[in-house]
Amino acid sequence: MKKRVYLIAAVVSGALAVSGCTTNPYTGEREAGKSAIGAGLGSLVGAGIGALSSSKKDRGKGALIGAAAGAALGGGVGYYMDVQEAKLRDKMRGTGVSVTRSGDNIILNMPNNVTFDSSSATLKPAGANTLTGVAMVLKEYPKTAVNVIGYTDSTGGHDLNMRLSQQRADSVASALITQGVDASRIRTQGLGPANPIASNSTAEGKAQNRRVEITLSPL
């Protein structure tokens, strides 16, 4: 079993080293970048920890998870967020939730038609299922802060919109916490009609503005 664990780690770290290689402009030779080296070392350590912390039956699985998380940590902040972004894109495929990158931050835009009915702060089943996928990734990559912001369109009173947007942000946060995400990582805020991403003069624009954004930032 130990040989299998080390083989898994070696394969992961080797793949990372190859993918992280660059060409030295002075020698013309391929070299491993610092992030790739760090990721490879991290994968070896992570695989060992993952295997040791798992039961005999699950050691192979534990090694794989530990190797991935260790590689992300070893490769630095940028690599850590790169891997997390890729996993989120995979989980969010076909859900209607967009994943964008801004520097080292990852932003999930959850439109209202996915998450909530009109004037409601109760998550739809589709929204709850989507957040299950988000939570799975967040638990695998715990070194990120989670900022949940609720938005509305400009229809209705300002106080009502502020309250509703806060309630929706809180509902999303509660769902993540219920799925096992550490509550200490999460902050919520309701901004009502602020920061529109489309015009509030059309029904289509209003629909885009009714959303919850989850911003992930490195700790």
UniProtKB/Swiss-Prot annotation:
Q: Name one Pfam family in it.
A: Gly-zipper_Omp
Keywords noted in UniProt: Cell inner membrane, Cell membrane, Cell outer membrane, Lipoprotein, Membrane, Palmitate, Signal, Transmembrane, Transmembrane helix
Q: Where in the cell is it found?
A: Cell inner membrane; Cell outer membrane
Result of changing L164A? Partially suppresses BamB ts-mutants
Q: What is the effect of changing G150A?
A: Partially suppresses BamB ts-mutants
Q: Where is the lipid attached (N-palmitoyl cysteine)?
A: C21
Topology within the bilayer: Multi-pass membrane protein; Lipid-anchor
User: For this UniProt entry, what is the primary localization, expressed as one broad class?
Assistant: membrane
What does gene deletion cause? No visible phenotype.
PROSITE patterns in UniProt: OMPA_1, OMPA_2, PROKAR_LIPOPROTEIN
**SUPFAM superfamilies this protein is in?**
OmpA-like (SSF103088)
Result when mutating D153A? Does not suppress BamB ts-mutants
Which residues span the membrane?
Answer: 37-55, 62-84
Give the GO terms filed under biological process for this record: bacterial-type flagellum-dependent cell motility
List the S-diacylglycerol cysteine lipid attachment residues. C21
Q: Name one GO cellular component term.
A: cell outer membrane
Question: Which residue ranges does the record assign to the OmpA-like domain?
Answer: 103-219
Task: Give the range the annotation lists for the signal sequence.
Answer: 1-20
What does this gene product do?
Suppresses temperature-sensitive mutations in BamB when overexpressed.
| NCBIfam families (UniProt xref) | PRK10510.1
Q: What is this protein called?
A: Probable lipoprotein YiaD
